[in-house]
Amino acid sequence: MTAFTTPSAPGLSRRALLRGGLAGAGLLTLAACRSAADTASSAASGSAGPRRGGVLTVGTGVDFTPSLLFAQSANTLVQRLVFNTLTRYDDRLQPQPELATSWQLAADGTGITLKLREDVLFHSGRRFTADDVVFAVKNLQNPARSAQLRSTAATVTDFRKNGDFELTLVLAHPVSNLFDLFEFMIIPDSATVEDAVAGTRLVGTGPFTLTERKPGSSITFARNEKYWNAGRPYLDGVEIRIVPQAESLLSSLKTGQTHLSYSVRGKDVAALKSDPQFRIKQYDTGSGAYYIGANLTAEHVSDKRVRQAIAWAVDRDRLVQQALGGYGTVSSVPWPKSSPAYSEAGAGRYSHDPDKARALLKDAGLTTLTLPFAHSNEPGATAIAQILQYDLKQVGIETVLQPTDSPTMQKQLISQTMPALWTLSHGFAQLHPATLAVSAYPFNEARNSSHFSSPAYTDVVQKAWNRPDSDSPEARALYQQITDVLLDEEFVIDLAIAGLVEVAGSKVRGVDLNKFGYLNLDDSYLTA
């Protein structure tokens, strides 16, 4: 995504958190705004407004990986179809009600009391209660779930129930990203959670129920007739089709077999932009940042001069234009422009300068070297890897490309078994800045994919995280220190910031994504 619509997203001030009791009104306002927008859009297309019925088909290049249900992975389309979260962010990172209707933060930031909806049923017919929130938090605390926000979930040390629909979470210390956890944490059914991670059964409280899963082919869902959001969903069902070939995905969109996709290659999106059959939407979440990762246990890349040389070698502008179709912003830092951690100086720190790259390699005693370079075997990711391979070759760094399927790469990230270099995209910078450094596998100060460790990095990250605010001058100063470490050490070499790009057929309305890319179809419908 090129940029946010606002120069900076406000942090979660104590006042904003304490007025959570008014958030229900905010939810109604947002729903009204969304309905108004959809109505206006429908009027323009000759439709009378929201229409019940129909099955929405979604095309994606990567299959759903059930074992990563509770982690951020390459396919997060399923989560919000089947499940709900406690709260959801609006465009200004202000939490709005979902399963939690209101909240009250303790004055010292070490606890939060949640009031919960009383009209929610799981797909099995069981009533949702505070016990399910307790289970959801403990589920993310389980290391087996590989949840990136496990560290934030782990700050919850006690649960105090006041009946079935009020719960206080007691925290070990204040954290600046508590509502990031609530946006991320889906509420599963405790009785079937092991079936969920095995991919045999998904039971939640969400708008759709799983009807069939064909691994590598498709996943189908039917409307939840007992959904708590009255009158929703409009759709009869949803089918997610796995289409790994870029040309096949593009063809299925053009022929109308697929209504919606977030997996279209940048160059194909650019070609569709002027086609009236499609509506192109950039999500201004900055939820994806393309990067090169370095495994510091590997020969040569353990020297930060080599990593800095790589940062100077890459032509980021060409990468954005050729591989992303112009849908991205060149950046040396992970932060989108909306983040309180963003600065123009940081974003522009590394530009395309092959001479500087060669000089750094020479300082490191190298003129040429050969390194393994892993990348996702999806077409778009392969195109990015090939551009990077060319740039590195120009300064004397030969790379051997290692195409790998996305689930395997995710497991390698988690297990710290990446080769010397790899390229992927990361999230978590679109939220409160501390979340990136305590949650994202490439950046986690305690245990990251690069095997990077630094007392200074750990200290500043913990200071930024262990505070109730995220946007004060003191917090911003800590974010700058984190950025300084990242730009100097370059164990993660950021290249470009881009959000998801939605390609939708002209009949599709009301689609939304949350900050983690969970597909929300509560208000979606197909025009006649």
Where are these regions (language model features)?
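Periplasmic binding protein-like
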Residues: 56-59, 390-444, 474-478
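N-terminal lobe/hinge region of extracytoplasmic solute-binding protein
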Residues: 59-107, 138, 203-204
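Gly/Pro-rich hinge or "lid" segments in bacterial periplasmic/extracellular proteins
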Residues: 94, 182-233, 237
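Surface-exposed binding/hinge segments that line
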Residues: 115, 149-191, 212
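Alpha-helical secondary-structure segments
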Residues: 129-136, 164-168, 206-207, 235-237, ...
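Ligand-site clamp/hinge motif
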Residues: 226-271, 398
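Structural transition elements
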Residues: 325-363, 380-383, 470
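Extracytoplasmic/peripheral linker and loop segments enriched in polar/acidic and small residues
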Residues: 398-403, 407-409, 438-505, 528
